[in-house]
Amino acid sequence: MESRTVGVEHDVALHVGVAGDGPDVVVLTGGPGCVQYLERDNLSPPGHRAWYPESRGVGRSGGGPHDMERAIADLEAVRTALGVAQWLVLGHSWGGDLAVRYAVEHPDVVRGVIGIAGRGFQRDRHWSEAYEAGLGSEPVVDIEWVPEVNASLSDSFTRWIHEPDLWRRLADCPVPMRLIAAGDDIRPSWPLAQLAALVPHGSFSTVPGVPHNFWSTRPDVWVEAVTDALRDLTR
């Protein structure tokens, strides 16, 4: 895995890992506010050049708490600095939700979205109750995160999902989206299924028998799921 440093607005330097050759795909992690836990050679999608930015204020990147608008602006700054005209966007957990917003706001540069085990655009009470009831039953995966970045991005996410034109913009988004649930995730998957039915070129599927962080517990299954989705988006 090669490491690069990319300068973005406000004199902030972001860490970006890169591996492989082929069509470009940018990989976004969850949290929000987690380190770039998917930056591992054994998780890199075969036949693609994968970029692994670490978000502002986290890990090896400079800066601090920020909102979703800044997160997307950083992605665009990274893409431009790297000389990438278009790329596919792969996101896990909250990273999948960010990937969808990125596609809505920049459909000209996002070739397709793969969102795995996302939350979806909701703060639903029943969803939260199901999630909280399952806490403690998931395999423990130790991931570093920054609480202040988590809080600022979570607040920004809540504001965005309350925007009056959100569903109209999603329904008009031309970017193909593959939304994938983890079969043993404690997070209910119905928001992903609804989103796949709403966007013009969406699909929903479930990887059976794996938990939320199956990139860690079953990396072979993760790579297979990602490879299949990328193949579907690029054929």
Question: Which residues does each predicted region cover?
Answer:
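Conserved HGGG/HGGXW glycine-rich cap/lid loop of the alpha/beta-hydrolase fold
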Residues: V8-G62
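Active-site loop/oxyanion-hole signature of alpha/beta-hydrolase fold enzymes
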Residues: W51-L88, E224
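Gly/Ala-rich beta-loop-alpha elbow adjacent to hydrolase catalytic centers
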Residues: G91, G95, A99
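Flexible "cap/lid" loop of the alpha/beta hydrolase fold
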Residues: V100-V104, V113-E138
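Active-site nucleophile elbow and catalytic-triad environment of alpha/beta-hydrolase enzymes
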Residues: S152-R169
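Short beta-strand/loop motif that positions the catalytic acidic residue
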Residues: C173, L179-A181
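Conserved alpha/beta-hydrolase "acid-adjacent" motif
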Residues: I186-P191
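Catalytic histidine-centered segment of alpha/beta-hydrolase-like enzymes
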Residues: V210-V223
